[in-house]
Structure formats: C-alpha cells, structure tokens
Design a protein with these regions (language model features):
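Rhodanese-like catalytic fold shared by cysteine-dependent sulfurtransferases
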Residues: 1-7, 12-15, 22-55, 61-97
Length: 97
C-alpha cells in the first residue's frame, strides 16, 4: 500500500483517515471523518494508536510527512496509504471549482 488519490480514498470502505498536522490546522479545517493525531505523537507512539489489522490513510499539507510515515509503517507490517495530493492541494481543488 502506498500513495492514494482523494478520489480513490472516497471509494474505500473501512479505512481510518488520520490528519497528522498539528491540532490547530486540524481544528481550522480537515477531511470529513478524519481524526487528528499529530505527526510527532504518532511517529513516537504508533503502536499505541494503530492496529495491524486495520487500514489507515495519513495526510498532511504537502504529503511529505505522511508519505514517510506511511512507508515506515508499511515496512513494520501496518496497512497504510498516504494522500498523494496533500491537504492543501485537495483544499484548493475543492474550493476553487
């Protein structure tokens, strides 16, 4: 599992969407059904938050942190994706059409 587009993400069921941005950014705006676990909290305590039997999609503003996190967790046996577009591109595409 790896990068995923927002359109493909919308087609999937039983996936946990995790916003890894800071709490303030999440509070200002986030994807529907997303929960917030900031990057540094998650990377330092992933086993506390995640279950290897579940599927996750991470996103951040530009996808750099979410991609590195997803790659690391996939190597450890977790099932994860990251949002290719990043949240800022998603937001621009949704609000400027």
């Amino acid at each position: 599992m790896n990068g995923i587009t927002i359109n493909k993400l919308k087609e999937l069921n039983n996936i946990h969407i995790i916003d890894i941005r800071d709490n303030y950014s999440y509070t200002m705006s986030h994807l529907n059904n997303a929960i917030n676990i900031p990057y540094y909290s998650l990377i330092n305590n992933y086993s506390m938050y995640l279950n290897k039997n579940e599927v996750y999609c991470f996103y951040c503003d530009f996808s750099h942190q979410s991609q590195s996190l997803s790659n690391m967790l996939n190597a450890l046996g977790y099932k994860t994706y990251y949002l290719i577009e990043g949240y800022l591109e998603y937001k621009v595409n949704n609000y400027n059409k």
